[in-house]
Every structure is written in C-alpha cells, then in structure tokens.
Amino acid sequence: QAERVKEYMNYYILNVMEEYDPEMDQLLFYLPLSGSAFKKVYYDQILKRCVAKFVSSEDCVINYAATDLEQAERITHVVKMSSNELRKLQVSGFYRDVPITSGSVSTSDDVIDKVNELDGVSASNEDDEHMILEMHVDADVPNFEDTSGVKLPYVVTIDQYSSTILSIRRNYEPNDPNFKKKQYFVHFKFLPGLGFYGFGLIHMLGGLSRTATSVLRQLIDA
C-alpha cells in the first residue's frame, strides 16, 4: 500500500500539478536572496485540484512574537488577483457574492521596488488587480465562541481596498476536540536567523561589506 501511495503522489506531482516544478524552481532561486520563502499547499476552487504555490516572504506576514508557523496566531497571505479571478471565486461560492469597490492600494516598499526594477516591471493604477488579505488567525467569531474562552482557528479573507469581508471559514476539523488548525504553509530557510525569518546572502554579504568598509576607513585614518 505504501508503494501505491508513493507512486500515486509522484504521478500527481509530476503530471497533474503542472505548476509544481516551476514554482519550486522560483522558490529555490528566491530563497538565497531573501533567506525565507514559503510554499502554500491547498485545494484550488477554480482548478478543482490541489496546488502548491510559491509565496515570497513579502507576501507572507507573521505576527511578531511567532517562532514558527505552528505557534503563529496570525499568518496573513497577501494575494494579488484580477477582478475576473475574484468574480470566479464569488460565483463558485468560495467568497461572498457582494459588490467590491475597486481601487489601488499603496504598496510602496524599497525592496519590492528594487525587485520590480530588476524584473523590468512597474506598478500601474490601470492594472485590474485586487489585493486580498487571507488571514489564518485564532479568533472569537460572534455567536460561535468556544465555551472555554479559547480563540479558535479561522481563515478570514478581506479585500484590502474596500475592507469588505469575503469569507470566514473554520480552520480545524469539525470533530476535533483539540481544535488543531490546518497548516497550509511550509517555511524554507536558507540560513537560521535571529527570529522567525531566515537569513539570506543579502544579510550575510551586507554585513561583510559594512565590516570591510569600516576596517578600510580605520586603516586610512591610521
């Protein structure tokens, strides 16, 4: 049975999950630069199958006190999608079918701007794009609180521009007495860091560069 499961999983990853190899290649290229990268494994409502997508550290925001994904009380995945993709998810019933006000959200960031410059792309207000915040949180949902007072795992999805709630879903098995949250993310680190995120070549070489500059200045002053 184990052999059959292994063969099926290999077949599924290599033949059905067409995005697996390209997404993994992108992750492995990005990882040494950033120090941290993520894979998100989930069931896609549009493709009607499991997918494994690369998520950059800029698009995966963890609460400050977290030491790992299992202990994090809030994981926010910043999802960029077109109006057509958003509409498909609304029609399928995955999101609430409510009017969404369109508009641009300021995402100015020195790192993101530099990456876009290297890629040769630039942001445009004319892009038909929505910024969706998918938050995996421990929360008290009104009328669904646990009698113990413990916050339970939910996935709350919000459109960033309009602040409209698109969905609130339970993130644990209905019959689980321990309310263990489902984990969709896998964290890859290039080198261990001082906190949640890992260190990349930019962190290491940046420090060496500053040290070399300091030593050179001291030699000149001497």
Task: Report each predicted region and the residues it spans.
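Extended alpha-helical, oligomerization-prone segments that build pores/tubes and scaffolds
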Residues: 1-222
